[in-house]
Amino acid sequence: MGKGVGRDKYEPAAVSEHGDKKGKKAKKERDMDELKKEVSMDDHKLSLDELHRKYGTDLSRGLTPARAAEILARDGPNALTPPPTTPEWVKFCRQLFGGFSMLLWIGAILCFLAYGIRSATEEEPPNDDLYLGVVLSAVVIITGCFSYYQEAKSSKIMESFKNMVPQQALVIRNGEKMSINAEDVVVGDLVEVKGGDRIPADLRIISANGCKVDNSSLTGESEPQTRSPDFTNENPLETRNIAFFSTNCVEGTARGIVVYTGDRTVMGRIATLASGLEGGQTPIAEEIEHFIHLITGVAVFLGVSFFILSLILEYTWLEAVIFLIGIIVANVPEGLLATVTVCLTLTAKRMARKNCLVKNLEAVETLGSTSTICSDKTGTLTQNRMTVAHMWFDNQIHEADTTENQSGVSFDKTSATWFALSRIAGLCNRAVFQANQENLPILKRAVAGDASESALLKCIEVCCGSVMEMREKYSKIVEIPFNSTNKYQLSIHKNPNASEPKHLLVMKGAPERILDRCSSILLHGKEQPLDEELKDAFQNAYLELGGLGERVLGFCHLLLPDEQFPEGFQFDTDDVNFPVDNLCFVGLISMIDPPRAAVPDAVGKCRSAGIKVIMVTGDHPITAKAIAKGVGIISEGNETVEDIAARLNIPVNQVNPRDAKACVVHGSDLKDMTSEELDDILRYHTEIVFARTSPQQKLIIVEGCQRQGAIVAVTGDGVNDSPALKKADIGVAMGIVGSDVSKQAADMILLDDNFASIVTGVEEGRLIFDNLKKSIAYTLTSNIPEITPFLIFIIANIPLPLGTVTILCIDLGTDMVPAISLAYEQAESDIMKRQPRNPKTDKLVNERLISMAYGQIGMIQALGGFFTYFVILAENGFLPFHLLGIRETWDDRWVNDVEDSYGQQWTYEQRKIVEFTCHTAFFVSIVVVQWADLVICKTRRNSVFQQGMKNKILIFGLFEETALAAFLSYCPGMGAALRMYPLKPTWWFCAFPYSLLIFVYDEVRKLIIRRRPGGWVEKETYY
């Protein structure tokens, strides 16, 4: 950094602004790189004395108000800096002048220019150019407003962070407790928090009483985490003695010293990182840009060629400029901007019905071109509720039902041991169902209590009936709640069973701790001594369930003998007067947050669609790997390096990493990797799980995938996911459990939090890309029959065959509904069985599409139009050869005696009525040939007969364009308004043969493509 400072200091005053900007940019990049690094702090390692010395805080009395005021003046308020927001007017201007709109604006300006030139040089200039300019401007403004309305979402990332900032904080200053505004909390303050509070800043805990915090928005762990003064982990995000700004304290109380405030907190760093990241251009925006380059190239090439040609043909400079402008404007597809916007909007609406809410229209297509999905685990791939998965009793493992609708397997519930186990699980449990939920299915009911206990409660309620009744029957006398030192929970109950002693002691906790307190074990309802063999059996079961990524709890009980503990005995939990050893071990119950039902199928679909699914989670590697196997992210038979090492019984470092298709990467390993090593992992492993990752690492993984050229979708729900969501090509947030911040950073929100909805989105995205190609091919084709009349008018000097107003009637009238109807077309083949498109080679509009639309189908259409034009003029006495070179006298308003081929004389007014009738007929001919074009654009490879005519909107479009053409031709008063005149019915049929020719020509072309895949015809004409 010294270099930058030095330069600014010693350079002369005339330093260029460019240099300054460059410096700012470099500094921003350095800052961003700094934020991407892991959190480095050592406050969690300091002893209380060192903490006191570092912050100068009295650990019981806190800071003095004067010292706090000094620090506040030095550090500024404890608040997040809002990012620079884009003003709404700038966003509106982007919609008005971005991409496609620019092309139309240039067209409009050229029209006004041409009108200006004509007004200055002619006495009575025609108003066509003026109309065209006004219409083009109107089209841009209307579609711009429409797009702006669709995307009227501002960058509210920071506003949602603001909602996370607690308003009040309880601090101790000079020994007095006071509630102050959270913004006034300073580094070194002594702060007290209790259950229900938000943590006001990053705190180093110095004393705690049963304190648990919910870190899920930060680390993605769904279980509340215990907080205590003990230093338990090198990693500050994992140690118990740091509580983070804006996480929630769920139970207990704690005191801590503030170590970071505002932007310097861990959450503040994530916020700054998320708002500072630049999301790149969406793939569809790049495609539209590419398309504009193509069209502009064609327009300018034609314009300049004919400009030179008209000078060679001895037109004046002014006329040549008017022609140049006319040709460029005629090449602009006026209706296409509206068509693309409407097609994307329709798809967005369709996706919303399928639970995918798209915030940004262009993101609709991005999902279709996705090649890698980085998915969060908790709540996206899994159900986000702990569920009992297995039990071990009677020396065997039993499987519980983890399906969402309880349609899975059941186990033997007749064993006496199961009765004892379910009794302990129901009684030694503080979770309760919330009130008034009797009508809801058990699994859907809300529970007050921690995740593991509510899983047990629901399991017992499903298997054994009402737990409330069981608890009333066995009333509780005393209890010792779970704590982190003894790692068990114990309660003593009255036993109503006459055949057993009067008191029942039940205990649950960490399996190894519970086993240590037992001397016997219950097998098939009979108590037996716990020998080594049974201990081994326990150990194997414990390892097996733990290896499945499940959380295992052990359960034991003891029937307290009546002679020692008669009825009314006073149990004392402080000075324990009852046995807590030599108990009877009953069994294990293991829990997992199980996969959602639809996920394995969705992952399979992604795989067949060529999309790589990577799991990125903050959870433990074992759990992550188990879920990855459960949902098919690691498919059957694919091994990780560890699996291969275990199978061959060799150390892990002797296995060649390339032999393993699957790979589980721990966050701590990722921390020390270079970007080249990460690239290697992403390149050579097809199935990857990243576990125990931090927010910054999620971002690094996304950037790694993008370096490989992948188009990356990221799913996430926590604040921790927001930088990755913002950086990804498409960020997908969760609608139900997602934090506001993640929803703001994302481009799309899954309303049902289900990974399977993403697959629906991919399908819709691929379909709209295919259908947009069809819409564009359809729209561009009519450009040729619109341009050629003008070109022939210049070269052959004939009366103008088609006027500007009629061109507008096609582009903004008859072609609109049919072009949009193609968005409703069904897929030709299974789009989910092909690889993602390659953004470099598979373009929305390529040279082949242009050559088909302009060079082939468009030419046939133009022939149809000219045929009609010559037929009408011939019927009125002007034979084709007589027309050559007649233009100057024809357009001269003072000449009233132009002779036709039969010697009849025509006044100026009469000639113009015939000319405008020709314009109308040419327009109707284009509508007739566009019928065939619409039908052939339904498919790109299949025959139309295979595809069928199921698209009702398209059939409506055919009728609509015909009805509109008839209305414009026959409506009284159109002659004065749009200069369109009624046609003889026979003139409608002139273009029919050409329409049929287009249909036959294209069916033959597609037949050859299907018969000879990869052949010359496919290479040249398949778009």
Swiss-Prot record:
One of its GO terms (molecular function) is P-type potassium transmembrane transporter activity. The modification N6-succinyllysine is found at residue 661. Residues 596-717 are annotated as: Mediates interaction with SCN7A. Residues 6-96, 151-291, 341-775, 825-849, 937-952, 1001-1023 are cytoplasmic. The modification Phosphotyrosine is found at residues 10, 260, 542. SUPFAM superfamilies: Calcium ATPase, transduction domain A (SSF81653), Calcium ATPase, transmembrane domain M (SSF81665), HAD-like (SSF56784), Metal cation-transporting ATPase, ATP-binding domain N (SSF81660). GO terms for cellular component: apical plasma membrane; axon; basolateral plasma membrane; lateral plasma membrane; melanosome; membrane; myelin sheath; organelle membrane. The sodium/potassium-transporting ATPase is composed of a catalytic alpha subunit, an auxiliary non-catalytic beta subunit and an additional regulatory subunit. Interacts with regulatory subunit FXYD1. Interacts with regulatory subunit FXYD3. Interacts with SIK1. Interacts with SLC35G1 and STIM1. Interacts with CLN3; this interaction regulates the sodium/potassium-transporting ATPase complex localization at the plasma membrane. This is Sodium/potassium-transporting ATPase subunit alpha-1. The gene is Atp1a1.
